[in-house]
Amino acid sequence: MTALKVGSESWWQSKHGPEWQRLNDEMFEVTFWWRDPQGSEEYSTIKRVWVYITGVTDHHQNSQPQSMQRIAGTDVWQWTTQLNANWRGSYCFIPTERDDIFSAPSPDRLELREGWRKLLPQAIADPLNPQSWKGGRGHAVSALEMPQAPLQPGWDCPQAPETPAKEIIWKSERLKNSRRVWIFTTGDVTAEERPLAVLLDGEFWAQSMPVWPALTSLTHRRQLPPAVYVLIDAIDTTHRAHELPCNADFWLAVQQELLPLVKAIAPFSDRADRTVVAGQSFGGLSALYAGLHWPERFGCVLSQSGSYWWPHRGGHQEGELLEQLKTGEVSAEGLRIVLEAGVREPMIMQANQALYAQLHPLKESIFWRQVDGGHDALCWRGGLMQGLIDLWQPLFHDRS
């Protein structure tokens, strides 16, 4: 068979996203491709194509920024790395005409963060990869799952929901703002007995990566009980950064204003042991804060990549919530908690490990998971479903 000429039309038609080759039982060599729409270097003004892979080349790694290399005389850019056989994560490309974003040969963490902040608004998904969505930072990303990546319950066999989610507008007197909220119900159990799950960053789980098919699938397979799901929009990054980190007003507004509104539409159980609060990053911090401060209402906490360093971004001081646990100001006694963090988000992992060590005496009701991934919704979506399964498992015994 004649080899295709690199950069020819037929060569590009043979490409369907990243390609990998097994190196050994644990590692693969992975090559990424991008086609320059301006053509070869003779015609193109593109100087760099940055590769932003969550948990591999992002600012969490404090690593040298990585750029694709052009194959001379062609419209082909490529970049090769090595990934674990069980790795899963999202990535994007950032073509740019500038070559001065990262000035130092080895930028420090702050410069890395600032450089990526400037570049990411220009990020694009991989045009060769059909699996893409709008990430939490607002830019497009694509999915990469290596052959031995762990199963993600519900996402492996999604089912269309019988009833669509209902979108409402919550106008909060306490918070003095308005936002969208999505209400989703599954199953046909007696309404007042249905458990409740509150999902933070609701617009992401409702629109960018809709959870309805995965929840429907797991309910049909009896891995999740019939339930009511409430997805709360964060409004924008400014409101998110103010309302989610340890904010009593936000959670009082949820309890006093939003939940009665939801209950009139979709009745649910008031029992704390049937109620889950789930969140990621600031949302993970917020979920545990709610459980620790209102355990009579929120008895189950699902925290993924929780920002337990808050409010000390450098990671050199213990976060506020951990300090409160250590001094006895709050207690996790009686809560069921799922705590998950990625090995490729070092500062987040360190803070979560410190928190887990503090919670470890309650190990019967703590589920601790380390994921081979970064600060990444593609990882979180599987942990979200598994976390709901773990936290609500006792309900199946209640009904039997």
Residue ranges and their predicted role:
Residues T2, L23-D25, E29-N86, T96-P153:
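Aromatic-rich carbohydrate-binding modules that target alpha-glucans
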Residues W87-P95, R194, F250, V254, ...:
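Short beta-strand segments enriched for Tyr within beta-sheet-rich domains
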Residues W182-T185, E192-E203:
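Short beta-strand element of the alpha/beta-hydrolase
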Residues V198-A266:
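Cap/lid segment of the alpha/beta-hydrolase catalytic domain
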Residues G202, A234, L302-P311, V343:
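Active-site nucleophile loop of the alpha/beta-hydrolase fold
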Residues P210, D270-Q324, V330-S331:
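Primarily recognizes the serine-hydrolase "nucleophile elbow" in alpha/beta-hydrolase
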Residues W309-L378:
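The feature captures the conserved acid-bearing segment of alpha/beta-hydrolase catalytic domains
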Residues C379-I389:
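Post-His helix in hydrolase/transferase enzymes
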